[in-house]
């Protein structure tokens, strides 16, 4: 019992222990399940968060799409509302809105665009091959920022290569190693050792070839593959590489053998010692069974040569040329490239070809000519290109490439088949020999004839065979059975003809290029080329035709074009391609015409081209200009071109006739070298030349004749401009002629124009004291002589007093306008004739516009628009010209003060004008309030700004010691601006003397007036009245400063009584000052330069630029700038006009500093790209197919002096138009797919 109980107890204890163990295991399993569930929950939460984020992004995108659709609907509604009143009925086609960019959500969800670097490394060890490939692709596109990331990446890749079982993943990992080995943070030697280890232990062919490719990539980046100098460490590495890859040369895989051969050719450490061994090794692999290995061996030989080794011609050449008959085109292509290297490096090396010795370059040329007949297009194209690059080829081989003739050699004589190279003398000799034999046979006795008949019959048969020419026509030679004659290889014969007749246009174009290159080096070959190049003008492909035209142009100076060939060239001027016609125009300028009939045919063809395509006018004019300058035959066809008949008087043609202008371009340019043509021209042609050289200065010569007998410039009648009332006496007036032939005479013409503008006596206003004294003395001496007075009056009428005298006389407004027009015409003419004086004449022309605005405002009324016009012109004069002297700057500052005063007064009148209660009329003479009206006060800001400008003017004149004008002195006195350093005692004494002189002059003038009144009563002439009025005007001019002082003193007296403020007094004085203001005389003392910007026109294309308006539009801008100092002030401006509102929309784009490339001092070339944001611009058109003109120009920005916030923009170039066409996503959808 005890035993049983004890056993039971033991069993119970064991059961309890087992239950406890089971409970513990169950508890552990529950814990593990809980942990696993927690991990799953966390993963689910993360996935849910990612899904929520994606959903939020999709919702945001949908909201943006809805907003865009709403905006588009609103814009469409606005457009429909605007189009309803116009009642435009157009078919409406509602297309689906595809303005949203296409986004593949599945790709974005699978590929984590914003994954961290650690997650990508973890994905490399994933079991999913798709995830591995995605990670490898993204890692290859990333850049390594630091060294630690590079070490981690290399470690992970190496670790995965040991474990990876898939070969395609191994290939991707090895390629990734090769890509990152080029990074500076990566140790490339370590990666190289790892790849060599893989080569030793790997058996996969794909993995081995990938290792060899990446080893070659790494070796190219190292220094030991770039030359002969090798360090000890790199030499050991090279030896190690060779040891590892040498067994792979016997691999069964052709891919492995190919990559091994390529690698051996690129890592040879000592080219002088080991190159021969490598060449022998590669020579053995030229006979490999796989074409890829043969191709690789040929490439390796060329690589060894490019690295500086010398190739053994005797060992390699005969084996290489056997591969020209290889069945694979890649091998044949590399073969002709390699033998081309042999031919150019060792041209005079003698080789044996067909049992004869020949120069290596000639034999290579023959082999390449054979390749022109190859079945592969790639080989034929390469062969045609290499023919032109083969140098020092014998002339007989070059000539044979242009004909289908078979060339044979025997006993030093040359024969041809297919052409009559055998002369007629040789044929006559044969005929004479035959006749002699027949005569000898007839003279023999008849008894002997039968005995000789058996022997004679074969001879007669032989003579018939050799004597008759039925088998070989006249001029040919029978080479059948001639053992002493060797026929050349057929590949050379007609090689270029075969290339020109190829069915692929790439081969034809390459043949044309090679013919052109060989013709440049050989004149005889060039002369034979012309027929074939001209025949290609009829090719069906436009690019081939243009290439042949340009090739003929390059050799046109060395050859002579025949008349038949010229007619073929001229016939192509009817082509519809603009580029082809322009190429033909350039060709006609480079060829030599043989006779005058060719010149006449060329001229007529160009005129026909002008009538059919008027847009070619500039190209045709340039062609006729160069033809006229280079051909001496124009003298013989002048009568036909101008339709001149010596029997009849010539009729003056219309100068606007474009065909007459084209003929005159040819004729007048021929006069430069052939002066005899001038005597054949009618008289009106010289007058037409003056008009043509101003209208077309680029195509007409500026000088025709240096003799003084022929006057080429018109006479300028200055008195007729000033005194238009005396038209009857114009014949008696003095005239001055100006013959503009060189820069000195152009300067003289400019001075005459300035004297016409400013007067014969430029200081007529400032120096009236001396003039008045002389006039008084003359009047006192000649009071009793009326005839002398009449003569003096006539002389005074012939004088030119300039614009200031006419400006003072209000009755001579028409004469003043004519004076300005004449001066403007002269300035424009000087700008078109002389480039050195163009900036100066342009400056005077701008100043003339300032004078016209001041005169027009003084005659009518002064508003804020006149001030804006003056400010705009002043900005151009101050900022668009370089090198202006200080006197001109001071005058421009004076005009700036005048324009600022007009701006102040105009703003006051506008602010004080109240709305009329009844109908009132405003006076047309002035918008300013009169002095008797209610007092107006100036603001303190306006007074401060005006005083600031006056102080700047005063300081500038003192710094450079310049004289202050009388009009500005009155303003300085008004505002009490003085300088104690300059206003010394001498100036005070001079002022007193001037006052005394003025008083004396006033007394003398009164006496003169009395005497003149008596003479008027006696003679009763109207001319003396006009003279007295002019004298009174001169006196008023001298007394104007004193008048201003008197008015100020009178106003001071009135203001004391009426108790007005000083600002009202200043207002009245400024009104008086503007009414009496006379613009000063401006003269430039030195040569100046003008800023110029030329935007290069884009390539002409009929199709507009299509773009999506939701994305920015990229445009490439090229320009040339000159005389620009501050490059930071230059910007690119783009403008387009709205069709519906008419407003101009503009954008300003910054030009980066890297876009400027200097060409000469202060001159640059600009090349940059701009991005235009043109959203919703497609609504700015009436139809979906209508393009929008976009204007691009280069401008300069300046801060306004009055207000720093305002910016003034000055255009420096003419705008260039880009036609753009906004399209919907529907049109671009196939391109995106």
Curated annotation (Swiss-Prot):
Residues 1014-1030 have a biased composition (Basic and acidic residues). Signal peptide: none annotated. InterPro entries: ARM-like, ARM-type_fold. The keyword Acyltransferase does not apply. HEAT repeats lie at residues 236-273, 275-310, 487-524, 525-561, 563-597. Its main location: nucleus. GO terms for molecular function: protein-macromolecule adaptor activity. Keywords: Cytoplasm, Nucleus, Repeat. GO terms for biological process: RNA polymerase II transcription initiation surveillance; snRNA processing. The keyword Isomerase does not apply. One of its GO terms (cellular component) is INTAC complex. Component of the Integrator complex. The core complex associates with protein phosphatase 2A subunits, to form the Integrator-PP2A (INTAC) complex. Component of the integrator complex, a multiprotein complex that terminates RNA polymerase II (Pol II) transcription in the promoter-proximal region of genes. This is Integrator complex subunit 4 homolog. It comes from Dictyostelium discoideum.
């Amino acid at each position: 019992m005890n035993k049983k109980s004890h056993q039971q107890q033991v069993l119970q204890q064991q059961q309890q222990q087992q239950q406890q163990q089971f409970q513990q295991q169950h508890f552990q399993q529950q814990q593990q399940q809980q942990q696993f569930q927690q991990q799953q929950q966390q993963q689910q939460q993360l996935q849910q968060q990612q899904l929520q984020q994606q959903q939020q992004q999709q919702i945001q995108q949908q909201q943006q799409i809805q907003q865009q659709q709403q905006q588009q609907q609103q814009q469409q509604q606005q457009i429909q509302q605007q189009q309803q009143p116009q009642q435009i009925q157009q078919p409406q086609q509602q297309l689906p809105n595809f303005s949203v960019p296409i986004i593949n959500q599945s790709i974005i969800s699978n590929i984590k665009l914003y994954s961290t670097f650690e997650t990508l490394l973890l994905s490399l060890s994933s079991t999913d091959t798709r995830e591995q490939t995605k990670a490898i692709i993204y890692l290859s596109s990333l850049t390594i920022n630091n060294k630690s990331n590079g070490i981690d990446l290399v470690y992970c890749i190496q670790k995965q290569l040991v474990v990876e079982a898939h070969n395609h993943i191994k290939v991707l990992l090895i390629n990734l190693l090769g890509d990152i080995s080029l990074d500076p943070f990566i140790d490339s030697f370590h990666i190289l050792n790892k790849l060599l280890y893989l080569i030793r232990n790997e058996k996969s062919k794909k993995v081995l070839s990938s290792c060899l490719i990446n080893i070659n990539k790494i070796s190219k980046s190292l220094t030991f593959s770039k030359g002969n100098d090798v360090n000890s460490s790199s030499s050991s590495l090279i030896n190690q590489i060779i040891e590892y890859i040498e067994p792979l040369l016997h691999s069964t895989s052709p891919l492995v053998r190919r990559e091994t051969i390529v690698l051996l050719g690129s890592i040879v450490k000592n080219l002088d010692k080991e190159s021969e061994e490598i060449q022998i090794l590669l020579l053995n692999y030229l006979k490999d069974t796989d074409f890829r290995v043969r191709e690789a061996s040929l490439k390796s030989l060329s690589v060894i040569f490019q690295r500086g080794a010398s190739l053994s011609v005797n060992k390699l050449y005969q084996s290489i040329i056997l591969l020209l008959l290889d069945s694979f085109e890649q091998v044949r292509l590399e073969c002709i490239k390699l033998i081309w290297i042999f031919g150019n490096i060792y041209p005079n090396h003698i080789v044996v070809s067909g049992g004869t010795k020949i120069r290596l370059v000639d034999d290579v040329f023959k082999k390449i000519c054979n390749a022109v007949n190859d079945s592969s297009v790639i080989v034929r194209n390469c062969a045609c290109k290499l023919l032109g690059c083969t140098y020092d080829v014998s002339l007989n081989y070059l000539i044979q490439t242009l004909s289908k003739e078979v060339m044979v050699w025997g006993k030093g004589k040359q024969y041809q088949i297919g052409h009559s190279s055998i002369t007629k003398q040789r044929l006559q000799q044969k005929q004479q020999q035959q006749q002699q034999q027949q005569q000898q046979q007839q003279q023999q006795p008849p008894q002997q004839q039968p005995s000789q008949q058996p022997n004679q019959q074969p001879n007669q048969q032989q003579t018939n065979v050799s004597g008759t020419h039925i088998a070989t026509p006249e001029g040919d030679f029978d080479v059948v059975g001639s053992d002493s004659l060797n026929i050349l290889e057929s590949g050379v014969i007609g090689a270029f003809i075969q290339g020109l007749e190829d069915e692929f246009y790439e081969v034809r174009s390459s043949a044309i290029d090679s013919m052109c290159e060989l013709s440049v080096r050989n004149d005889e070959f060039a002369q034979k080329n012309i027929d074939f190049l001209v025949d290609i003008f009829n090719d069906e492909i436009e690019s081939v035709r243009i290439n042949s035209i340009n090739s003929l142009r390059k050799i046109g100076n060395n050859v002579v074009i025949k008349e038949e060939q010229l007619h073929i060239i001229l016939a192509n001027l009817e082509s519809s391609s603009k580029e082809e016609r322009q190429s033909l125009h350039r060709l006609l300028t480079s060829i030599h015409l043989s006779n005058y009939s060719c010149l006449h045919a060329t001229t007529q063809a160009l005129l026909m081209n002008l009538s059919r395509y008027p847009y070619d006018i500039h190209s045709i004019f340039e062609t006729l200009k160069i033809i006229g300058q280079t051909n001496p035959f124009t003298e013989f066809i002048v009568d036909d071109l101008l339709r001149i008949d010596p029997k009849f008087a010539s009729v003056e043609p219309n100068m606007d006739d474009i065909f007459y202008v084209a003929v005159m371009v040819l004729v007048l340019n021929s006069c430069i070298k052939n002066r005899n043509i001038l005597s054949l021209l009618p008289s009106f042609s010289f007058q037409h030349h003056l008009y043509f050289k101003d209208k077309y200065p680029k195509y007409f010569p500026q000088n025709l004749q240096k003799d003084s007998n022929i006057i080429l410039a018109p006479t300028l009648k200055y008195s007729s401009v000033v005194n238009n009332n005396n038209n009857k006496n114009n014949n008696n007036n003095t005239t001055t002629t100006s013959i503009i032939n060189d820069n000195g005479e152009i300067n003289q013409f400019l001075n005459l124009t300035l004297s016409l503008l400013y007067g014969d006596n430029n200081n007529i206003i400032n120096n009236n004291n001396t003039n008045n004294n002389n006039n008084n003395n003359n009047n006192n001496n000649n009071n009793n002589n009326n005839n002398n007075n009449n003569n003096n009056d006539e002389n005074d009428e012939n004088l030119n007093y300039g614009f200031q005298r006419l400006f003072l006389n209000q009755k001579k407004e028409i004469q003043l306008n004519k004076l300005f027009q004449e001066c403007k015409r002269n300035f424009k003419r000087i700008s078109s004739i002389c480039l050195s004086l163009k900036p100066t004449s342009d400056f005077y022309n701008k100043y003339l516009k300032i004078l016209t605005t001041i005169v027009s405002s003084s005659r009518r009324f002064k508003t804020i628009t006149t001030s804006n016009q003056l400010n705009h012109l002043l900005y151009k004069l101050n900022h668009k010209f370089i090198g202006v002297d200080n006197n001109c700057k001071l005058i421009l500052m004076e005009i700036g003060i005048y324009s600022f005063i007009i701006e102040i007064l105009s703003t006051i009148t506008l602010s004080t004008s109240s709305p009329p209660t009844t109908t009132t009329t405003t006076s047309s003479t002035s918008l300013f309030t009169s002095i008797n009206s209610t007092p107006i006060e100036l603001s303190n800001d306006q007074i401060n700004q005006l005083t600031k400008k006056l102080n700047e003017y005063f300081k500038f004149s003192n710094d450079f010691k310049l004289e202050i004008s009388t009009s500005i002195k009155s303003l300085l006195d008004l505002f009490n601006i003085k300088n104690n350093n300059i206003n010394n005692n001498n100036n005070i004494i001079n002022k007193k003397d001037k006052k005394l002189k003025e008083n004396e002059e006033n007394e003398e003038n009164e006496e003169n007036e009395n005497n003149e009144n008596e003479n008027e009563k006696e003679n009763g002439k109207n001319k003396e009245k006009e003279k007295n009025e002019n004298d009174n005007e001169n006196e008023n001019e001298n007394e104007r400063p004193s008048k201003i002082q008197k008015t100020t003193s009178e106003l001071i007296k009135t203001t004391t009584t009426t108790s007005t403020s000083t600002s009202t007094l200043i207002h009245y004085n400024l009104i008086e000052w503007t009414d009496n203001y006379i613009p000063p005389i401006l003269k430039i003392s030195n040569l100046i330069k003008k800023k110029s910007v030329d935007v290069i026109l884009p390539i002409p294309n009929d199709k507009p630029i299509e773009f999506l308006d939701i994305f920015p539009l990229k445009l490439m801008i090229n320009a040339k700038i000159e005389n620009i100092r501050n490059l930071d002030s230059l910007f690119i401006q783009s403008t387009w006009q709205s069709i519906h509102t008419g407003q101009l929309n503009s954008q300003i784009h910054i030009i980066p500093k890297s876009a400027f490339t200097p060409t000469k001092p202060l001159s640059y070339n600009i090349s940059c790209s701009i991005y235009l944001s043109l959203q919703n611009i497609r609504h700015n058109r009436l139809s979906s197919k209508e393009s929008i003109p976009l204007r691009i120009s280069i401008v300069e920005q300046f801060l306004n002096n009055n207000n720093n916030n305002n910016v003034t923009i000055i255009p420096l170039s003419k705008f260039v138009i880009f036609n753009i066409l906004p399209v919907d996503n529907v049109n671009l959808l196939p391109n995106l797919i």
